[in-house]
A protein has these predicted regions:
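Membrane-interface loop-to-helix entry segments
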Residues: 54-72, 107-122, 214-232, 276-285
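Membrane-interface helix-loop-helix junctions at transmembrane boundaries of multi-pass membrane enzymes
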Residues: 76-84, 140-142, 234-252
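Hydrophobic alpha-helical transmembrane segments of polytopic
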Residues: 4-12, 63, 67, 82, ...
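Interfacial helix-loop-helix junctions of multi-pass membrane proteins
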Residues: 22-31, 94-114, 164-175, 212, ...
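Extracytosolic (periplasmic/ER-lumenal) interhelical loops and adjacent juxtamembrane/interface segments
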Residues: 24-58, 170-212
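A juxtamembrane structural motif centered on a specific transmembrane helix
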Residues: 126-143, 288-302
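Aromatic-anchored segments of alpha-helical transmembrane domains
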Residues: 16-17, 89-98, 154-159, 254-264
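N-terminal signal-anchor transmembrane alpha helix
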Residues: 2-28, 152-164
Length: 302
């Protein structure tokens, strides 16, 4: 099952990246119904602009469906609790995908769909590492908890990034590290509470400028917290002079630097599509690298 799981992991990574491309090209409503497109299993003949967005959305659905089949097969053959949880998660992801369309890109649902994709990929990464890497480092429960908390921080930061994307707040601050010349601009904390209104289409965002600034800056401050926390933690891990810790830590460090630089470049270059997609891919790679480090640590004596 090792090779099978790795294939599923790469497929999940592709689904996450293509999902980001779908959001960033405003193709999320390219097909206004679900699971088909205008009532058809493939994109029907429509005007050129709608056709491109519709095909982007449907290819994303086809790829996600293929991943679901892989995960179902994995559950049938492994029968483990983790594979069962993964199978249930994929079913819930399919529902979120449907609601993303039927609820017209309501931000909490869009963010939940993004997080569900990341968690699916993360669980597949953990299973793949479990099949591939036997050697672990015995550490204290305190150190294990500290590294695990770093994983939780990454999860929250990905959620904030999803909130930025789903509320179209990426371009609201054109400078760095300030926002419109202010390090601490005016904030509107209602930006994190968006009730659902059946009469609204949320494509393009409905929040005012101050609310979007709030979302953007919270994501930035979250990035600072993640970088500082992980830099201090990695320095400590490197000082342990354990080869496995150093190798796993270097992967995290590279992914962290890469992701932070992509975030800054996206601000200065006005969010070109390839950099925006790369920023989402970078978040996925950072998550995988941190899960790898967590897996390599064992706080229980065997």
């Amino acid at each position: 099952m090792k090779t099978f799981t790795w294939i599923a992991l790469f497929l999940a990574f592709g689904v996450v990246v293509l999902g980001a491309y779908t959001r960033l090209t405003d193709a999320g409503l390219g097909c206004p119904d679900w699971p088909g497109c205008y009532g058809k299993p493939i994109v029907p003949q429509i005007n050129a602009i709608d056709s491109g967005k519709a095909w982007t959305e449907m290819i994303h659905r086809y790829l996600a469906g293929s991943l679901g089949i892989f995960i179902l097969i994995n559950f049938i053959f492994s029968r483990s609790k983790l594979s069962f949880c993964l199978f249930l998660l994929v079913i819930f992801q399919a529902l979120l995908g449907m609601w993303t369309v039927t609820k017209k890109l309501h931000p909490p649902i869009v963010m939940a769909h993004l997080l569900g994709g990341m968690v699916t990929m993360g669980l597949l990464a953990f299973i793949a590492f479990k099949h591939s890497f036997v050697q672990q480092i015995l550490v204290s429960p305190k150190l294990w908890s500290t590294v695990f908390f770093g994983l939780v921080l990454i999860g929250f930061q990905i959620a904030f990034g999803g909130w930025v994307s789903s509320n179209y707040a990426a371009l609201v601050c054109p400078d760095f590290p300030t926002c419109l010349g202010n390090l601490f601009p005016n904030m509107d904390w209602n930006a994190f509470f968006i009730p659902y209104d059946t009469s609204l289409n949320y494509e393009g965002g409905i929040l005012n400028h101050t609310a979007r600034v709030t979302i953007h800056m919270v994501h930035r401050f979250g990035a600072y917290a993640v970088v500082v926390y992980w830099f201090c933690l990695l320095v400590f891990l490197f000082r342990q002079k354990q080869a496995i810790l150093i190798q796993a830590g270097v992967l995290v460090l590279m992914a962290l630097i890469f992701q932070f630089l992509l975030g800054v470049l996206n601000v200065f270059t006005k969010l070109p599509l390839f950099l925006a997609v790369a920023h989402n891919a970078g978040a996925a790679l950072l998550l995988i690298s941190v899960i790898h480090l967590n897996y390599r640590l064992n706080s229980r004596k065997t």
